[in-house]
């Protein structure tokens, strides 16, 4: 019984949706391990087309500082330089007319798989 309650709570945390103006902000808690760089690809939800020109920011744990940022290339790929290991950071993924996604990450020394982020068109 306790396990199922924890799973439900975890599911709620992973699917928290907050309305912000015209865009929806999805806050997803995800801990990943990163070796040399935090890399991934941003796709448009529903079509899986690459999302080019999307801003990907690595923010400090208090959200006050953008540690590093980049934009996706024409194929939706991005790569951020590795910050200090063992620390908690947030990733913010945004583009005009698209929902905003924010992820919590803890940087470790191990290798991580490439992230795939699906952005939805804002409604």
Briefly describe each language-model feature range.
Residues 79-88:
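Short Pro-Gly-centered beta-turn/loop motif in secreted/extracellular proteins
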Residues 18-37, 41-47, 120-122:
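Beta-strand-rich domain onsets/edges
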Residues 105-112, 118-122:
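Short beta-strand edge segments in extracellular beta-sheet folds
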Residues 62-77:
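Short, acidic Ser/Thr/Gly-rich low-complexity loop/linker segments typical of extracellular
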Residues 63-65, 90-106:
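A short, solvent-exposed loop/turn motif at the edges and junctions
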Residues 36-38, 47-62:
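Short, ordered, surface-exposed loop/turn motifs in non-cytosolic proteins
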Residues 78-80, 113-115:
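Short strand-edge motifs at loop-to-beta-strand transitions and within beta-strands
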Residues 6-9:
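N-terminal export leaders
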């Amino acid at each position: 019984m306790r396990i199922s309650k924890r799973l439900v709570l975890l599911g709620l945390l992973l699917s928290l949706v907050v309305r912000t103006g015209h865009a929806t902000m999805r806050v997803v808690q995800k801990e990943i391990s990163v070796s040399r760089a935090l890399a991934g690809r941003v796709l448009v939800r529903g079509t899986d087309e690459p999302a080019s020109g999307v801003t990907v920011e690595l923010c400090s744990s208090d959200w006050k500082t953008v540690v590093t940022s980049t934009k996706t290339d024409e194929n939706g790929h991005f790569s951020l330089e590795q910050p200090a290991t063992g620390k908690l950071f947030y990733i913010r993924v945004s583009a005009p007319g698209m929902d905003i996604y924010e992820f919590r990450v803890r940087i470790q020394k191990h290798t991580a798989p490439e992230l795939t982020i699906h952005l939805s068109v804002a409604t």
